[in-house]
Design a protein with these regions (language model features):
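A membrane-topology feature that recognizes alpha-helical transmembrane segments
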Residues: 1-176
Length: 176
């Protein structure tokens, strides 16, 4: 939720602490626990009683269920399974964040997409078997080619759009 709220506003994800958007009450840690706090406060700010959007508890439940599904699918296996569970949890958290930001602002922050690309590349080195490879170098090569083809395809579509329509619909730079 903090990512969904702050990333489009280009605010720090760490500071300042969470606060009520209406009265600016700084939410202490014990009132900022996923799901539990929303239920304890009956969906209202402790200070001003302003309703807290049900989106908050919905995102928390959705993310929790996604993490649970990843753990149940991969986590009970050996070390590679735990790494897969953590990796898929991060990927799903990024997708959930991107989806809700896109619903509200019609953007997907580069930090999410490029972070996912970097995560995929690093996991390829740690788990070469994802690319049906025995060595990390073969897996990294496959991952790198995937990045080049996928990224190149996006850039090609953007360039074609610019040629045909005179503008790009998905800017990759802030001043474009």
């Amino acid at each position: 939720n903090v990512c969904i709220h702050r990333m489009p506003l280009e605010q720090s994800l760490i500071r300042p602490p969470s606060q009520c958007p209406k009265c600016r009450f700084a939410i202490p840690w014990h009132l900022n626990m996923p799901i539990i706090s929303w239920l304890m406060l009956r969906g209202k700010c402790k200070q001003c009683a302003e309703p807290i959007s049900p989106r908050y508890i919905g995102v928390e439940i959705l993310t929790g269920l996604a993490f649970l599904a990843c753990w149940l699918t991969f986590g009970n296996q050996s070390t590679p399974g735990v790494l897969l569970a953590v990796t898929w949890s991060l990927v799903l958290a990024g997708l959930i964040t991107a989806t809700f930001i896109d619903f509200e602002h019609f953007i997907i922050p580069d930090e999410i997409t490029l972070g996912g690309v970097a995560l995929g590349f690093l996991v390829s080195a740690a788990l070469p078997s994802l690319h049906e490879a025995e060595r990390a170098t073969a897996s990294l090569t496959a991952s790198g080619l995937g990045i080049l083809v996928g990224g190149g395809s996006v850039l090609a579509v953007l360039q074609l759009g610019k040629w045909f329509f005179g503008k790009t619909r998905v800017p990759l730079e802030e001043n474009e």
